Swiss-Prot record:
Residues 122-138, 180-192, 247-259 have a biased composition (Basic and acidic residues). The gene is N. It comes from the Viruses. This is Nucleoprotein. Residues 219-331 form the CoV N CTD domain. Packages the positive strand viral genome RNA into a helical ribonucleocapsid (RNP) and plays a fundamental role during virion assembly through its interactions with the viral genome and membrane protein M. Plays an important role in enhancing the efficiency of subgenomic viral RNA transcription as well as viral replication.
């Protein structure tokens, strides 16, 4: 006779609606799921994980002698039209004597099983930790105090007792629904410390997103946040974010070319290498506070020294000559190129350097009105542009981890 109990014995962890919550209790449960969240391979057909440390997830409820178990491979699939498609494997941790391989002794060879043990663990003993009932307990966030898996694996950062938002990067905040007896013994971190960890994790994840696009909403937020925290999004002019360029006072850096191109101008990237970080500005500046009718004004005076033997010293000097009080000027070897797309504003200058829509006949030049115009797109200009962007010797220059300063705690 078929029994309904048979459906409960499955190798796959039951679906989890809420993540996070209390530490695994010392008494086991009737479920068959891992207490911990999974580690996930980054590629299909990856080799079993190797660990920098013991490979046993942190669990303060257990003695050192009980810190041993195994990681078990779980094949994963996602539904596609007409069937399913394999995705990189997940690996779940179980204590020795529990879970799908409960009948194995520590060290027994079996495909898809990796045995791990902490230093001083009694691997001959079997655990009474049990497995997790997903209807009663949430997955516990992974922590490895002595080192986690190798670089071929990842896992979502879940702060303890934090709420989820979107895809799994935070734990459920359903702690208030837990039994009071567990609430009192849980959570040794303060709320502010958890906030800091969550923010740090988000920063790391954001920095690891290669090739991520900046949406219009994000760009608008970058350009209109508090003035001292603004950054120039792609496609924005300098004066759209920081106001018109001036001479002899604040906002005096940038010539017309830099203003038009924004962060596309290679000189911006070069000069950001010399701009102090937030901490350097605060603790390395001469800070002058002044009360004004509109509020408190803070003035930061900071000096960056570029040694004369710096390989790019001459380029820095050249950029400063061009851009300090540079409003209304352009580099001598630069000519505004004809716009490839229509402009909503008609040209007002009578000495326009190039006729409209002159793609096929490049040799046709405007009448001799400005000798500098004829020098556009020469090899000299290309050489100068290459120098300004410092593409020749990237190993000489350290552009810093975050030149735009977006991800600062």
């Amino acid at each position: 006779m078929a029994s309904g109990k048979a459906t409960g014995k499955t190798d796959a962890p039951a679906p989890v609606i809420k993540l996070g919550g209390p530490k695994p209790p010392k008494v086991g449960s009737s479920g068959n799921a891992s207490w911990f969240q999974a580690i996930k391979a980054k590629k299909l057909n990856s080799h079993p994980p190797k660990f920098e440390g013991s490979g046993v997830p942190d669990n303060e409820n257990l003695k050192t002698s009980q810190q041993h178990g195994y990681w078990r491979r779980q094949a994963r699939f996602k539904p596609v039209k007409g069937g399913r498609k394999p995705v990189p494997d997940a690996w779940y941790f179980y204590y020795t004597g529990t879970g799908p391989a409960a009948d194995l002794n520590w060290g027994d060879s079996q495909d898809g099983i990796v045995w791990v043990a902490a230093k001083g663990a009694d691997v001959k003993s079997r655990s009474h930790q049990g497995t997790r009932d997903p209807d009663k307990f949430d997955q516990y966030p992974l922590r490895f105090s002595d080192g986690g898996p190798d670089g071929n694996f990842r896992w979502d950062f879940i702060p303890l007792n934090r709420g989820r938002s979107g895809r799994s990067t935070a734990a459920s905040s359903a702690a208030s629904s837990r039994a009071p007896s567990r609430d009192g013994s849980r959570g040794r971190r303060s709320g502010s410390e958890d906030d800091l960890i969550a923010r740090a994790a988000k920063i790391i994840q954001d920095q690891q997103k290669k090739g991520s696009r900046i949406t219009k909403v994000k760009a608008d937020e970058m350009a209109h946040r508090r003035y001292c925290k603004r950054t120039i999004p792609p496609g924005y002019k300098v004066d759209q974010v920081f106001g018109p360029r001036t001479k002899g006072k604040e906002g005096n850096f940038g010539d017309d070319k830099m203003n038009e191109e924004g962060i596309k101008d290679g000189r911006v990237t070069a000069m950001l290498n010399l701009v102090p970080s937030s901490h350097a500005c605060l603790f390395g500046s001469r800070v002058t506070p002044k009360l004004q009718p509109d509020g408190l004004h803070l003035k930061f005076e900071f000096t960056t020294v570029v040694p004369r033997d710096d390989p790019q010293f001459d380029n820095y000097v050249k950029i400063c000559d061009q851009c300090v009080d540079g409003v209304g000027t352009r580099p001598k070897d630069d000519e505004p190129r004809p716009k490839s797309r229509s402009s909503s504003r008609p040209a007002t200058r009578t000495s326009s350097p190039a006729p409209r829509q002159q793609r096929p006949k490049k040799e046709k030049k405007p009448k001799k009105q400005d000798d500098e115009v004829d020098k556009a797109l020469t090899s000299n200009e290309e050489r100068n542009n290459a120098q300004l962007e410092f593409d020749e010797e990237p190993k000489v220059i350290n552009w810093g981890d975050s030149a735009l300063g977006e991800n600062e705690l």
